[in-house]
């Protein structure tokens, strides 16, 4: 079912009346198949020439949270494809189920990469400008985005919000092509500052252009609206930096 966001811009007339025009960003769920399994993504277009953002969900699966973030970006002039890495209808609510679905992909990095590339291909089929694209991810999605960066695929940039930072054994960033932006809460007990420092050293050694930012007092999942972990200051600052990253890396 299509989801439509409207933005209303009112022009005041000299007579004291107002005339409102409506600009619509249309978003919709998109079913696509990868190796016999159906996945359910979300695509919102800001126009055929708009830069593209590939968004990867956290361990809850693709939910209203990612849809909201996608629509926020569309309102700024970016087309967005929110990928589904779990499968249609799989939106785990229990921790054990979340661990199961993320764990399966952590153990099968080849499948993770295939799903990311399939999502990019689907975005392209819908008119997304894949030659002018950045990938972003939250938590598990952040780890997936770094996996994508290590694959050597040619995206303009890779951004993570409180994402997993550890590099699997046998992998490195020698083939990474885009710039990397990492936004991390210094009070995150799930992903430690030791991992943050280790990634910084890896990227520096590999010669990857990177920016690593920490936010004091911010725990894991500090951007999730309405949760006990939400930190407004860190959320607003990280979002502002991310949108600045998009402006600098994507051609208008």
Give the label of every model feature segment.
Residues 154-164:
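A conserved short beta-strand
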Residues 29-128, 226:
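Serine-hydrolase catalytic machinery in alpha/beta-hydrolase-like enzymes
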Residues 137-141, 145:
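Gly/Ala-rich beta-loop-alpha elbow adjacent to hydrolase catalytic centers
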Residues 197, 204-252:
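C-terminal catalytic histidine-bearing segment of alpha/beta-hydrolase fold enzymes
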Residues 182-184, 188:
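Short beta-strand/loop motif that positions the catalytic acidic residue
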Residues 9-21:
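Bacterial N-terminal signal peptides
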Residues 190-195:
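Conserved alpha/beta-hydrolase "acid-adjacent" motif
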């Amino acid at each position: 079912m299509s989801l439509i966001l409207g933005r209303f811009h009112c022009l005041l007339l000299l007579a004291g009346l107002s005339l409102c025009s409506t600009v619509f960003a249309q978003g919709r769920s998109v079913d696509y198949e990868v190796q016999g399994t159906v996945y359910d993504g979300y695509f919102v277009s800001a126009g055929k020439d708009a830069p593209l953002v590939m968004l990867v969900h956290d361990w809850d699966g693709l939910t209203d949270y990612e849809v909201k973030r996608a629509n926020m970006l569309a309102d700024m002039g970016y087309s967005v494809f929110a990928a589904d890495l779990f499968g249609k209808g799989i939106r785990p609510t229990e921790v054990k189920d979340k661990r199961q679905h993320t764990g399966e992909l952590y153990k099968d990095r080849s499948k993770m990469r295939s799903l990311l590339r399939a999502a990019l291909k689907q975005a392209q089929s819908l008119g997304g400008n894949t030659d002018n694209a950045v990938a972003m991810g939250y938590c598990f999605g952040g780890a997936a985005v770094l996996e994508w960066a290590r694959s050597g695929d040619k995206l303009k940039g890779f951004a993570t919000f409180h994402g997993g930072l550890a590099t699997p054994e046998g992998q490195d960033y020698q083939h990474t092509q885009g710039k990397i932006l990492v936004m991390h809460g210094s009070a995150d007990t799930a992903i430690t500052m030791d991992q943050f420092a280790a990634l910084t050293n890896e990227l520096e050694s590999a010669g990857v252009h990177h920016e690593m930012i920490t936010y004091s007092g911010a725990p894991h999942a500090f951007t999730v609206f309405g949760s006990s972990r939400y930190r407004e200051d860190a959320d607003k600052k990280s979002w502002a930096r991310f949108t600045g990253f998009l402006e600098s890396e994507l051609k208008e």
